[in-house]
Amino acid sequence: DWNIGHRVSRVDVEEKVLGTGKYPDDFYFDGMLYGVALRSKYPRARVLEIDTAAAKALSGVEAVLTAEDIPGENKIGHLKHDQYSLIPVGGLTHYLGDAIAVIAAKDRETAEKAKKLIKVKYEVLPHIRTIEEAAAEDAPKVFDEEENNICAHKHISRGNADEAIRNSKYVISHHFETPWTEHAFLEPECAVALYDEDGDILVYSTDQSAHQTLHECSLLLGTDRVKVQNALVGGGFGGKEDMTVQHLAALLTYATKKPVKMKLTRAE
């Protein structure tokens, strides 16, 4: 009874207390493959060449995919579609860890071996470390196709700041910095993708934005035959809003026609 004035229990409390609830990593399916991503070693570099031949030849590997294998749109993003799902040849990496290729294999150990066999040739470029550097007129462009590094600009004016400062008894001018903060949820990000009985790709995900996951997976695959079901979420704090493994697991399932589990390591 959800009427005002009635006491209600959390809808997920029973399955959590009894241990029957499932997080994505608790899902296992017959013939399930394990996915990993080869990630950029450089925060800003141009990818010149990707050689996946040796990885594809490794026993137990079912798929090695690059940007060329994406059937829909490579670029996704919640606010603006400017984030590469997989960095293509000729494209720029944007941070340490940008995905360049994904591998699906019979087990994670084999997938990790295959990852080490992929050869990538980079042109390492100067990277941008601060907002101030990025906003400078002569800053290297983060995105080739953009005029500059300013995503949006808005001017806000409230009151008379100069007058307020002039009439203040004390005025302190200083530069303050705070450290980076990791969301540090207990559960690493994980997704399991498979074809369901309707012939749709079903993604079991642990994220905070199931509708965005659905939209961006559909965009990547070039089809609306995608479903997203949120499993239990082991913490998020805003850190599980963007795509990390969901769309890549879906892509590997699309290519292999098999269930695929993909999970970030704690280091990732």
Regions found by a protein language model. Give the residues of each.
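Flexible, low-hydrophobicity surface segments
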Residues: 1-148, 171, 255
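General beta-strand structural signal in soluble alpha/beta enzymes
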Residues: 19, 63-68, 95, 172-176, ...
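A generic local secondary-structure boundary/capping motif
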Residues: 25-26, 82, 90-93, 161-162, ...
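Alpha-helical support elements that line or immediately flank enzyme active sites
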Residues: 37-67, 102-121, 191-256
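Short acidic loop-to-helix transition motifs that present clustered carboxylates
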Residues: 69-72, 178, 186, 210-211, ...
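Short secondary-structure boundary/capping elements
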Residues: 85, 181-185, 244
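Helix-loop-helix junctions that connect adjacent transmembrane helices in secondary transporters/permeases
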Residues: 140-219
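FAD-binding glycine-rich core of flavoenzymes that anchor FAD
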Residues: 251-267
